[in-house]
Curated annotation (Swiss-Prot):
This is Beta-citrylglutamate synthase B. It comes from Danio rerio (Zebrafish). Keywords: ATP-binding, Cytoplasm, Ligase, Magnesium, Manganese, Metal-binding, Nucleotide-binding. Residues 115-300 form the ATP-grasp domain. Residues 359-387 are annotated as: Disordered. It comes from the Eukaryota. Mg(2+) 2 binds at residues 273, 275. Belongs to the RimK family. It is found in: Cytoplasm. Its cofactor is Mg(2+); Mn(2+). It is an enzyme of class 6 (ligase).
Length: 405
């Protein structure tokens, strides 16, 4: 049976960095492994049910060869269950393994839905309130008082750090009520003061942490999104942080995701957000990684032919280990931190001094802490902080030391 992989994305984000890089990597891997590949935009697909059987058309073409695995990149804040999710459900019902699955995407479309899924699993979360009804923001001004002030206010479908506010007091909340748009509900969330202006973005592929990046605001604002002028730096993550990110990923059922963590003074973490359509332009640059290539390798590993091969290899290894008397030897691989992502003129976590005079000044902006890293056209030079004495290199060094203690 011929192996087939599809890449499906939304026309609105098809020309952005993550989609372009995943398309490149998938094409390369499929050519190397003799896998049939097809690239489609969501609005090109026509769903059919004929003679009681599910089918697909692309334009006037009746599709007869379906993929075993399909990578999906949709702008999660704008996902519509009556259109986008319907297409993905159709493919899933036809036996296609989706990365990510429809339910995993839905779990991250709305920030409160994400917390609903995580609640009850022992995941540390900031106390959060929301509301039903179309426009009950004003009523929540009184209802959310137990959270204290200042309080974080977020649009449930916000993205890229937008529609996020820090309300100083009740009067400030009343002012916000007149300014915000009410298409989606808002969250009222406990303010984690210790993590103001910084968070840790953890990227996972196939349920495994592939890297982590410390993000810091450069202008004193609460959000640390690189798309808003924040800067990112590769940083090692404690075992507790890794385990928490993996736990969140598994609960939400995601294959590829970004988990944003806030850190308290005692070194513990709380979950800020989860991103099913994680962007990785700044992550690639900060960590010296090719996330798209890692995603492509994972996707091809899901093909039935690969899974069968893995089972055969496991069988051989198992029988060999039972008959062999030789002890297994694990050879540790050398950990290399690229010099271009080290902290300039400071001490790296591994104890070496970085020679680069100002690596952080070359960092590009990344997308969002929230769902999708849409609209890379907004990326630009990092704004200069309001305080001229603000030293981002010193801040990053101290934060990385805190994270690894």
């Amino acid at each position: 049976m011929c192996s087939r992989v599809w890449f499906i994305t939304d026309r609105r984000i098809s020309q952005e960095y993550p989609q372009i890089q995943i398309l490149r990597a998938l094409k390369e891997r499929c050519v190397e492994d003799d896998v049939e590949f097809r690239y489609l935009l969501m609005d090109e697909i026509v769903l059919t049910i004929t003679d009681g059987q599910l089918g697909l058309r692309v334009g006037q073409e009746i599709v007869t060869s379906y993929p075993q695995v399909a990578v999906v990149r949709v702008p999660t804040p704008w996902v519509q269950s009556d259109s986008d999710i319907t297409v993905l459900r159709h493919l899933e019902k036809m036996g296609c393994r989706l990365v990510n699955r429809p339910q995993a995407i839905l779990n991250c479309v709305n920030k409160f839905w994400t917390f609903q899924e995580l609640a009850g699993h022992g995941v540390p979360l900031p106390d959060t309130y929301s509301y039903g009804g179309h426009d009950n923001f004003r009523k929540m001004i009184d209802e959310a008082e137990p959270l204290g002030y200042p309080v974080v206010v977020k649009n449930a479908r916000g993205h890229r750090g937008k529609a996020v506010f820090l309300a100083r007091d009740k009067h400030h909340l009343s002012d916000l009520c007149h300014l915000i748009r009410h298409e989606a509900p808002y969250l009222f969330q406990e303010y984690v003061k210790e993590s103001h202006g910084r968070d840790v973005r953890v990227v996972l592929v196939g349920g495994r942490v592939i890297g982590s990046m410390l993000r810091c605001s450069t202008d004193g604002r609460m959000q640390s999104n690189c798309s808003l002028g924040g800067v990112g730096m590769m940083c090692p993550l404690s075992e507790q942080g890794k385990q928490l990110a993996v736990q969140v990923c598994n609960i939400l059922g995601m294959d590829v995701c970004g988990i944003d963590l806030l850190q308290k003074n005692d070194g513990s973490f709380v979950v800020c957000e989860a991103n099913a359509n994680v962007g990785f332009i700044a992550f690639d640059q900060a960590c010296g990684m090719d996330v798209a290539g890692i995603v492509a390798d994972f996707v091809l590993s899901l093909l039935p032919s690969r899974l069968s091969r893995k089972m055969s290899l496991l069988s051989v290894v198992s029988s060999t280990s039972e008959t062999s008397s030789e002890p297994e030897v694990c050879i540790p691989t050398e950990v290399i931190i690229p010099s271009e992502v080290c902290i300039p003129n400071e001490i790296c976590p591994l104890g070496t001094t970085c020679p680069i005079p100002d690596a952080m000044s070359t960092m590009s902006t990344s997308s969002t802490s929230s769902e999708s890293e849409a609209d890379l056209t907004e990326t630009g030079p990092t704004p200069v902080g309001a305080n001229p004495a603000y030293n981002i290199n010193s801040l990053l060094a101290s934060e990385m030391k805190l994270l690894t203690e």
